[in-house]
Amino acid sequence: MTPSPSSTLEAPPADAARERSSETPVLGFEAAAVMSRIDALAEKHEGHDDAFRSAMAQLLKAELVKAREVAQAELLAERHGRRTAERLCALHDAIIRILYTAATRHLYHSHTPSDSERMSIVATGGYGRGLMAPESDIDLLFILPYKQ
């Protein structure tokens, strides 16, 4: 089966690295702890979406830098590029799940969303193949609910 050029959060995992639970730390990145910090930021910036987005972006960028340092150290120690690329993709999976959770929990919250009120995230490129180079970026398309 040929990998799709895009991936969604609801798509089945591409490989073993993507099957990791969101609770399993990847490259030192602890998703549950980061999500707790984001929830605290949302509470602190309640009613100020721009300030919340900025604070969340700063937090996630700092966590990404730390995780990339861990990835580099693991790559140099293990000398296994594909494994590192898979781990980086799993890291990005965790970050995208956090972004989705933060957006649906704090920015576009709906207690009982209908089909037309659900947000979708679409990614393209190497991310869809489950492999990320160390300095790769991800092109994401957030498809927002028609009611905002």
Placement of each model-derived feature along the sequence:
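Catalytic metal-binding acidic patch
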Residues: S120-Q148
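N-terminal regions immediately upstream of nucleotidyltransferase
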Residues: T2-E117, E135
